[in-house]
């Protein structure tokens, strides 16, 4: 058996191929897992659990079917869907996890997270993140009419795209010191995360021992998952 990790699907109605690929994954590979962990940015945007977008209901039903088959499903918020709440979690039968979680997997201690908090060189993004994670601001935003939230979200995505276009790739990647700090804080030799869309397995030193950082890929033209078993930790890409 295996525990599966995915992230950065960025599901939206404009990308039906990714949605179809995810549905096939949920109906196939995911059903044979010990557990499924979604490490953020499942959706391209999330403006509230009350959004009647049919895609959201479709995904909730598909994830719940995995849970109903006996495979527990877990979710860590990403920078795109950090407002995903308890209502959607109930509808999909997913367990919401904190932004950093340590798992005991087949004899390994594994730290999982979305990964955006590791990009500490991007001061502009970190300042923005601190603002939008303010509980009072989130409560105010979610109290706005749905059409207003849609406009605000569209403007924020456009601003983010424009800002990122002028940033260096290095600034938008993780900071190595932040990685080591997180791994030593939690006393782990394995870290799995997404966010950067740069799939790879990196070797480093943490806790004065060899350690590994496994980065999930985004679902653009193919799927990406990390498969953890008693024998191995694999970063796998697969066709939709």
UniProtKB/Swiss-Prot annotation:
The keyword Transcription does not apply. It comes from Shigella dysenteriae serotype 1 (strain Sd197). Its main location: membrane. Mn(2+) 2 binds at residues 41, 79, 114, 195. Keywords: Cell inner membrane, Cell membrane, Hydrolase, Lipid A biosynthesis, Lipid biosynthesis, Lipid metabolism, Manganese, Membrane, Metal-binding. Signal peptide: none annotated. GO terms for biological process: lipid A biosynthetic process. Its cofactor is Mn(2+). This is UDP-2,3-diacylglucosamine hydrolase. Hydrolyzes the pyrophosphate bond of UDP-2,3-diacylglucosamine to yield 2,3-diacylglucosamine 1-phosphate (lipid X) and UMP by catalyzing the attack of water at the alpha-P atom. Involved in the biosynthesis of lipid A, a phosphorylated glycolipid that anchors the lipopolysaccharide to the outer membrane of the cell. Pathway: Glycolipid biosynthesis; lipid IV(A) biosynthesis; lipid IV(A) from (3R)-3-hydroxytetradecanoyl-[acyl-carrier-protein] and UDP-N-acetyl-alpha-D-glucosamine: step 4/6. Mn(2+) 1 binds at residues 8, 10, 41, 197. Belongs to the LpxH family. It is an enzyme of class 3 (hydrolase). GO terms for molecular function: manganese ion binding; UDP-2,3-diacylglucosamine hydrolase activity.
